[in-house]
């Protein structure tokens, strides 16, 4: 009979993504230096001061390998600004980069930040970011910037009158030129509630990085074909109507009635 006293495999912890700790920094520096000396493509040792500052500011995320307990990837920028994502060479091709991106997406969603932006560095990373759903911004400065708009759906209340909503975003020149084509036109369904608020079934967003020439973007809202407002998003009057600022642009979840004067 086979022995029942075979040694059990050692249990290993699960790999985790978390904020960096002091003990993570030396191992990261060590493998960055080793890969830089070996000429590994896509090494960010040259940005060490940026990485160290992100750690100090508690903005550095690390992927801790469950078997070794060591950091084998890191990310800074949280996909809300140009940042860095690097995976240790011998851990590439295992989906770690994809997991780091998904983690950052969830962080952004929890903060109600649906407009993501990155810089694809090195340029060989462009296919990866495109697979992650990012779109390159033509002629961007710095080059190879890319953006992504996360979808956010809302459950409409049972009460209220169904309405059709169209939101348009224009460049600043719409303020003085009527014959100006909208940069973005998006439609949504909604419910007009007893208090006059119109709740949309999805978030309507405008990503500033995707349209750098828009300058002070102008927003127009129509409900059942009737214009509700058209003006610069930054104006207080529009923000009272539901135009909301986020890190990388603007969004509308609901249209509020005009305040009585």
Outline where the language-model segments fall:
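Short amphipathic alpha-helix that is part of the acyltransferase structural core
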Residues: 2-46, 64, 162-197
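Active-site rim helix/loop that mediates acceptor-substrate recognition in acyltransferases
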Residues: 32-66, 197-218, 222-229, 234
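Short hydrophobic/aromatic beta-strand element in the GNAT-like acyltransferase core
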Residues: 58-62, 74, 84
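Glycine-rich phosphate/pyrophosphate-binding loop shared by adenosine-nucleotide-utilizing enzymes
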Residues: 68-74
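Conserved acetyl-CoA-binding loop-helix of GNAT-fold acetyltransferases
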Residues: 93-106
């Amino acid at each position: 009979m086979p022995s029942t006293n075979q040694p059990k495999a050692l249990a290993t912890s699960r790999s985790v993504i978390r904020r960096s700790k002091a003990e993570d920094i030396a191992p990261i520096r060590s493998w960055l230096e080793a890969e830089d000396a070996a000429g590994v493509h896509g090494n960010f040792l040259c940005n060490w001061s940026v990485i160290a500052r992100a750690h100090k500011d508690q903005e550095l995320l690390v992927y801790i390998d469950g078997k070794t307990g060591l950091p084998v990837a890191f990310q800074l920028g949280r996909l809300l600004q140009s940042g860095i994502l690097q995976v240790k060479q011998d851990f590439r091709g295992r989906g770690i980069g994809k997991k780091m991106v998904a983690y950052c997406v969830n962080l952004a969603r929890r903060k109600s930040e649906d407009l993501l932006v990155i810089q694809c560095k090195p340029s060989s990373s462009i296919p990866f970011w495109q697979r992650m759903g990012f779109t390159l911004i033509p002629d961007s400065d710095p080059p190879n910037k890319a953006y992504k708009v996360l979808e956010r759906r809302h459950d409409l209340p049972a009460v209220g009158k169904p309405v059709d909503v169209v939101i348009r975003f224009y460049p600043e020149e719409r303020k003085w030129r009527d014959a100006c084509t909208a940069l973005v036109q998006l439609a949504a369904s909604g419910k007009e509630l007893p208090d006059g608020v119109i709740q949309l079934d999805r978030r309507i967003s405008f990503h500033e990085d995707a349209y750098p020439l828009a300058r002070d973007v102008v927003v127009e809202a129509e409900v059942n074909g009737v214009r509700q407002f058209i003006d610069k998003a930054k104006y207080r009057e529009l923000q009272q109507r539901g135009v909301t600022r986020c890190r990388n642009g603007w969004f509308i979840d609901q249209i509020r009635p005009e305040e009585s004067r």
